[in-house]
Amino acid sequence: MTVLKMTDLDLQGKRVLIREDLNVPVKDGVVTSDARILAALPTIKLALEKGAAVMVCSHLGRPTEGEFSEENSLKPVAAYLSKALGREVPLVADYLDGVEVKAGDLVLFENVRFNKGEKKNADELAQKYAALCDVFVMDAFGTAHRAEGSTHGVAKFAKVATAGPLLAAELDALGKALKAPAKPMAAIVAGSKVSTKLDVLNSLSTVCDQLIVGGGIANTFLAAAGHPVGKSLYEPDLVETAKAIAAKVSVPLPVDVVVAKAFAEDAEATVKAIADVAADDMILDIGPKTAEQFAELLKTSKTILWNGPVGVFEFDQFGNGTKVLAKAIADSAAFSIAGGGDTLAAIDKYGVGADISYISTGGGAFLEFVEGKVLPAVAILEERAKA
């Protein structure tokens, strides 16, 4: 994957527009989870150190396009950046017709989705973004799967279009895990439905040696193998699909599970052998024996890709499976990459973030890359690098 990299450019005195993913949760005007901002800070600092006039843009939430809304304003993000950088970071609302920014200055542009044509990737808007800068830096991996004005369109028209350090690191890490992984490779794919992760499962079945499934996905594979799943969430119409995937790659199945009679925070958890699952049981986690067996598989792996908790870890009595696997990944010497919102929440809960080789900032973009799909915002950077 050949793209121009911001780190290789002389940015002294240049007007640099950086597209970051600062779409963070905000409550009562305060940022409640800063992970994406923290991930973007090194890029912003580097551009300033290189002597650039720095303009940062992002979306936040899903406002009606072209209309300002207070709840989707980047004002709380500007306040957070000001505090984190120890300098005033002005929020600029009217910037499309040009803005005065000097070398060493930093401004944050208001939500790009307040601009008409952003989501439709309108050329007229993209050209206005491009006219603001000498160098465009795409650094928002989390939105790279969307062809929008500030992710794709601007890169078509900017004088120079480059990948920022965060985006470049994501592409390198994912490439390392998927293009030429050190073997053996294990993947953990968990979630409620096979249907939503079907392309991920199919893609990984061609590169990994062990495909560990969890959640509702595992229930469909258990049913495909003839095991009882009680009243657990599963997809009967995808049983044949599960069989076909299991014929291509080793899919180790749980030997024991944690069940309950209801899906509730105070539900009583019972460990059962898989053969003993009753008609009124719901499978809500893998059992302790299974967790240990899967942990052993992870210990011998050289590459691990993790997407999704294997149980309802939000309720502690159904969190042991995810906790054991999280610790096993952290303890492993393998190159490990993790991605997806629930996965990141599990990493936070069990405090293993420092011991995972790479944590992806992208949810949908992470999955689409794993599926082997082209990410439009990356494809345009590759095109521009060739030109």
UniProtKB/Swiss-Prot annotation:
InterPro entries to which the protein is assigned, alphabetical: Phosphoglycerate_kinase (IPR001576), Phosphoglycerate_kinase_CS (IPR015911), Phosphoglycerate_kinase_N (IPR015824), Phosphoglycerate_kinase_sf (IPR036043)
Which positions, given as ranges, span the membrane?
none
Q: What is the E.C. number?
A: 2.7.2.3
List ligand-binding residues for substrate: 21-23, 36, 59-62, 113, 146
Give, as one word, the top-level EC class: transferase
Q: What Gene3D superfamilies does UniProt report for this protein, alphabetically?
A: Phosphoglycerate kinase, N-terminal domain (3.40.50.1260)
Q: Which family does it belong to?
A: Belongs to the phosphoglycerate kinase family.
In Swiss-Prot or TrEMBL terms, this protein is called Phosphoglycerate kinase
Please tell me the species this chain comes from. Answer: Pseudomonas entomophila (strain L48)
Please state the gene responsible for encoding this protein: pgk
